[in-house]
């Protein structure tokens, strides 16, 4: 039986009569790394603040280990939060910052020292106890903030966009460190970000949010390979999205041509949207291509060229290729049936999951 450490049931949150969360329901299993992913204003940080006890719900229920916690104050919850700005005390050294919560609990000096040293060891800052916060880099401050959170041995660690202020190289390094730390500690992490690459890299499960709703939930691979709708396909990774018609199971038409695919379970001749990822398209000769396009522009992205093409109907196609293309040239695009992903309009996540299971069996 799965142990759901946190559950939301039909949670609504309003600020000044403006709904921020709209009947949100989900379950969080113990010991996993979860990410709330979405654009600014989608409600992801509000969920974090409700779990932490900083915000009340307007209606609905929040459960922790099966017990309703709507009225439980923040200091009585088994959660700790790492904030975007770290919220460290600049007048205290590293030891005193990490020990702050333990001193409030009135633990003995020996126990505090033991726990602080262990927390600093876990975040790879052993021997930094007397270092002043002002003397530390952004990455080191990030680790101190995490140490201060985990020293209290929370059951759930909440992280509110903690990597956003770091440069790209350090942010990438911290992704590895956070993932490794979560696996070593075995506690539940709930991470908030608008950065889809962070979410894909670190998470066991992702909740994609938009306008106060959880639009889709699943593993990073599921979210990337099987987006439920236009928003998810466009927000998570780069996508080419065109209108199409589902002629029958495993046969779809778009840009005036018929293509084999692996999707099914839809009505015959149902209007749909078709997704092809840029990395799944290969530039080839006109004879070998399934689509004919004209190369418009290209940018070198380091690991690949990002090539923008247009087909004869005016649809834009982005291609990721290790080879440079000739601008203005007519070329073919090839792809495999399994590279095509077909999306229905206004399909619920429950219906979407049921349809996938029906033709995966």
Swiss-Prot record:
For molecular function, the Gene Ontology terms on record are:
ABC-type putrescine transporter activity; ATP binding; ATP hydrolysis activity
The record's subcellular locations are:
Cell membrane
Q: Domain named ABC transporter: which ranges?
A: 6-236
Where does the chain bind ATP? 38-45
Q: Which InterPro entries match?
A: AAA+_ATPase, ABC_SmlMolc_Importer, ABC_transporter-like_ATP-bd, ABC_transporter-like_CS, Mo/tungstate-bd_C_term_dom, P-loop_NTPase, PotA-like, PotA_ATP-bd
* One Pfam family hit: TOBE_2
Tell me if Cytoplasm is a UniProt keyword of this record: no
Identify the CDD domains for this entry: ABC_PotA_N
Q: What class of enzyme is it?
A: translocase
Signal peptide limits:
none
Q: Which reaction does it catalyse?
A: ATP + H2O + polyamine-[polyamine-binding protein]Side 1 = ADP + phosphate + polyamineSide 2 + [polyamine-binding protein]Side 1
Membrane topology annotation: Peripheral membrane protein
- Per the record, GO CC terms? ATP-binding cassette (ABC) transporter complex
> Where is the major localization of this protein?
membrane
- E.C. number: 7.6.2.11
Q: Which UniProt keywords apply?
A: ATP-binding, Cell membrane, Membrane, Nucleotide-binding, Translocase, Transport
What role does it play?
Part of the ABC transporter complex PotABCD involved in spermidine/putrescine import. Responsible for energy coupling to the transport system.
Subunit-structure text: The complex is composed of two ATP-binding proteins (PotA), two transmembrane proteins (PotB and PotC) and a solute-binding protein (PotD).
The record, for NCBIfam families, names: potA
Q: Which family does it belong to?
A: Belongs to the ABC transporter superfamily. Spermidine/putrescine importer (TC 3.A.1.11.1) family.
Report the protein name in the record: Spermidine/putrescine import ATP-binding protein PotA
Record gene name: potA
């Amino acid at each position: 039986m799965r142990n759901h450490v946190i559950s939301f049931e039909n949670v609504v949150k309003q600020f000044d009569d403006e709904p921020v969360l709209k009947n949100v329901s989900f379950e969080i299993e113990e010991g996993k790394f979860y990410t709330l992913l979405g654009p600014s204003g989608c409600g992801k940080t509000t969920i974090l603040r409700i779990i932490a006890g900083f915000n009340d719900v307007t209606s609905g229920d929040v459960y922790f280990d099966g017990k309703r916690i709507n009225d439980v104050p923040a200091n009585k919850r088994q959660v700790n939060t790492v904030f975007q700005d770290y919220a460290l005390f600049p007048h205290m050294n590293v030891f005193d910052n990490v020990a702050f919560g333990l001193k409030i609990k009135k633990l003995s000096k020996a126990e505090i020292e033991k726990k602080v040293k262990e927390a600093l060891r876990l975040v790879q800052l052993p021997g930094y106890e007397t270092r002043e916060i002002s003397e530390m880099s952004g990455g080191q401050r990030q680790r101190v903030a995490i140490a201060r959170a985990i020293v209290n041995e929370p059951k759930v660690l909440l992280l509110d966009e903690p990597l956003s202020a770091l440069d790209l190289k350090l942010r990438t390094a911290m992704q590895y460190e956070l993932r490794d730390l979560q696996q070593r500690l075995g506690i539940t992490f709930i991470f908030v970000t608008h950065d889809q690459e962070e979410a894909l890299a670190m998470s066991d499960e992702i909740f994609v949010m938009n306008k106060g709703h959880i639009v889709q939930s699943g593993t990073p691979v599921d979210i990337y390979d099987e987006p439920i709708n236009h928003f998810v396909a466009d927000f998570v990774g780069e996508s080419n999205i065109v209108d199409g018609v589902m002629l029958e199971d495993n046969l779809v038409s778009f840009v005036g041509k018929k293509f084999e695919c692996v999707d099914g379970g839809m009505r015959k001749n149902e209007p749909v949207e078709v997704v092809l990822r840029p990395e799944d398209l290969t530039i080839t000769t006109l004879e070998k291509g399934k689509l004919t396009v004209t190369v418009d522009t290209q940018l070198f992205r380091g690991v690949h060229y990002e090539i923008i093409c247009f087909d004869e109907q005016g649809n834009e196609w982005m291609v990721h290729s290790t080879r440079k293309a000739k601008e203005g040239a007519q070329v073919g695009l090839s792809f495999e049936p399994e590279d095509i992903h077909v999306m229905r309009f206004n399909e619920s996540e429950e219906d979407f999951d049921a349809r996938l299971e029906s033709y995966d069996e």
